[in-house]
Amino acid sequence: MLLTKREKHLLAAFQNYGKLSLKQMIDLLKVSQRTVYRTISDLTDSLNTINISIIKENQNYFLVGELANLASIISLDTYEQYERLNLITYKLLMSFSSITNEQLQEEFNVSNVTIIQDIAEIEKRLADFDLRLDRKKGYRLVGNKNTLRRLLAILLTNNLSISDFGAGAYGHFEVLDKAKLELAKQIFQSSQEDLPDLDAKMSEFFIILLALSGWRDNEAVGHSISKAALDFSQKVYTEFSQKTNQFYSIQEILYYASILDELVIKRQETPLFHEKFDSAFFYNISNLIDKVSLYTKINFAKDKTLFHFLFNHIRLNLAVPQIFEDKSNNTIAHEVVQGNEYLHRVVSLLVQDIFPKYLQKEPEYELITLHFASSLRRSPDIYPIKILLLTDERPLARELLITRIKTIAPFVDKVVVKELAQYETKDKDYYNCVLATKPLVDKAVKMVSTYPDAKEMLQLQDYLQNVQAHQKIIIRDEQTNKQGYNLQNYFLATQQLLQEFSYQEIDNPADFETSVPKIMETIAAVSDKTYLSSKLLKCFAVSPLAIPETHLALLHTQSSKVITSCFKIYDLKRPVTALSMNYEKETVTRILVMLTRLDETKEMRDLMTAISQSIIENHLYTEIYKTGNKDIIYQLLNQIFTEKIKKLET
């Protein structure tokens, strides 16, 4: 008797645990209820031939009959569809000749129709990477050789878990040169400290890419490469060449450096002190946050951690996109989407509009939606609620209850306490919800125990999340912001930047390239104005920073020619044209200049970074930089510095 992998898995569970509920089988097989019923039916038909049945009793299923006959069962080595798609793609990438339909049928034990369907799905997905399928005498992948190699590295990274990769367990992918892969692992990891922090999956990708050196001749790399990427690539290839006893061409080194540059070096979260960075990527992340905020009417820009999470998530998934995933897995992200349908729809449409084709997968939309949904739940700044707590308990008991409420619902901005006897019906107009530690006649007041157990806390969490999702309009008291800090070094750096800040109109030439030297002439804090003008223009050519649809451009650098770090704004008498972050022409009427001394203090660098992030990441602040006068922007800078210092204090 032959069983599929899923049937064998279920049978083994019956043998190990005896009785299984439907929910246990769903969790075990990670499939839908319908698929479980079908698997039970198919397994029952197979077991009936050896006088064994599956019986249901009191919501549980178990085996009865001649159980000794189970020894005669043979499992069939079958694959789920996503496993087949990955393995067929792997074979197409590794093969230099065509693979026939018959060969694939025989290897995967499936029909001609199944292979045709699989090939159609593979062809559609690989078109996202600009690869096509040649169907002469079988199937063969055709496309740019660099893309083929990169796709192979992505596919292997998708299919080898971090633990399996670390242990050298490559499963169905043993065709790789295992010794070369282990050597690449050692060399890359020993030099990894020269790179910025990398996700474990990103490291795995670059190790595999290094091990694939020499696989298919690569094509010339056409764009400039940063010194940091080139130095690292030369270092690892020197050692790799020595230990493999193999010569690698300069094109191999340049290709590896170009991928490292694109995915890591130019995509650092703090771009201010990097001469080259991917300005389009930065703009896309902030643009996504801005557009989601616009269409949902929720100001996600207030969550200071959302940009960080999205930046790192999308950076990794652009580097190692999922090619074929297990669609039967119901992830946490999928469950979150069910309660945030509109948010998911908005995110999906915007990701399609902003990011490349190969990122366009439903699981990716769900994960990005999860980041926005988590932002709602995480921060009292985004979509806060205000609670009135009615209680006669002692201060310690009430403080403990408030702490537990804020733990399960961080989006609670404020909990105001009143005695039960002081409650008035009009109080409901000032709060999103009212809780009481004793039952009241008013049905709108929710009863909560002074010391709620875990079950009640979960119910309260669901209730508060529902209150947040369906907020009513309330009368809010005017709040005063208390600002204060005692970090002397940051205070001194703040004073210096505010003193050096200036705003002026300049009678500039008619083009951007000649306007920059004109601006430099006005800055006393620069010792070599010609040199710095040239450096700023070179940096701008590599990483353009005209901000789309704002008429703003940002010039920034750190240099030994800067005497005093400063931030200055220039209104141009004549508009000029400059390249924007998304590499389109932008009419510029105002230029922001950030100059940092080469040996500047950490405190000053932190504050300069805060300014750059406010310009690039926060569209509300960008609007102020675009239209504000000197006094308004001065106050904005003061606010940014204060927020930075308050964050450091806490």
Curated annotation (Swiss-Prot):
Domain PRD: 276-382
Annotated positions of the Phosphohistidine modification: H556
Pfam families xrefs: Mga (PF05043), PTS_EIIA_2 (PF00359)
Protein's recorded name: Putative transcriptional regulator MtlR
EC number: 2.7.1.-
Its job: Not necessary for mannitol utilization. May be involved in regulation of the mannitol phosphoenolpyruvate-dependent sugar phosphotransferase system (PTS).
Free-text note on domains in this protein's UniProt record: The PTS EIIA type-2 domain may serve a regulatory function, through its phosphorylation activity.
